[in-house]
């Protein structure tokens, strides 16, 4: 919004307001987006926490979980709404409203946030321990993921919504041909000439898995004070760098990345997400004053997945978000093995002391803060590995 306002003012007063040209610089707007989201989060945080406390929107704690967590019973939850509010205000202020990629990321983010809101509301306010039924939650996640995947399948190779529509019509008229331009290939990091053609349906399937999988993986990771939000900030910031490089024809050609016009504007969203995340961490650090809840975790995970798909870095996302991947795999392995052994031996057996993975380490004797900080360190290292793929090819 501010970029359009600055352009209008420059047309009216070109000599007096020439300094407003700074709004054209993507890096300047990204820094300002991060600062804006950070300040909004810090300013509104105490108000949101106080309001959640007054409404008695407190986090229920499982009795069969980690015993030390019982002291967290009643800590305000649904604080993810604060993150989303800060992201929304900051992004709307600083990004170019004509950019379709930012809009699709925001739609996915707030769509998943709405699912998380309903789930949290049923758990905390309606006192329904199940929240949304798994099938109901998965249906809505799948609907949003598939719609986004279908749009992005024709969007990454085109420069406008009109051309996206034209490409989609040609695809339908061709009898749903599986051909797709090279920009929709699966890119293998660290290799400059290796990529795998996905085709329309392959791209849609991969995009669906990445978006929905990322959303649920971040949600599973959000189990300790500050555990999920800092990796989200790190991975989101790294993806912002990929977005900047991918959106620039100069950097994309130099780094052998697919050039996707308009993708650079996603750096604004990534910066806002980082700023909002740091503001939330101020209140979510041990001992947490507020939890983000599903409204925050599902939304942020969906955002990371969508951005990674747009900048064609799905594999790099899996590397940088390795903690999220391990947390999700730990739950899948635990549940699968338990069901298998129960069916075969009559009694279920466990691979881990408790899933997700962070609870296993707690049960093993690690302090909560040790688990959190060590997972942060691992994520930092993985992000550096992911960023190194920009040049190491």
Curated annotation (Swiss-Prot):
Record has Magnesium as a keyword: yes
Predominant localisation class: membrane
Enzyme Commission number: 2.7.8.13
Compartment(s): Cell inner membrane
GO-annotated cellular components: plasma membrane
Cofactor(s), by name: Mg(2+)
Protein name (record): Phospho-N-acetylmuramoyl-pentapeptide-transferase
Species lineage: Bacteria, Pseudomonadati, Pseudomonadota, Betaproteobacteria, Burkholderiales
Name of the gene encoding the protein in the UniProt record: mraY
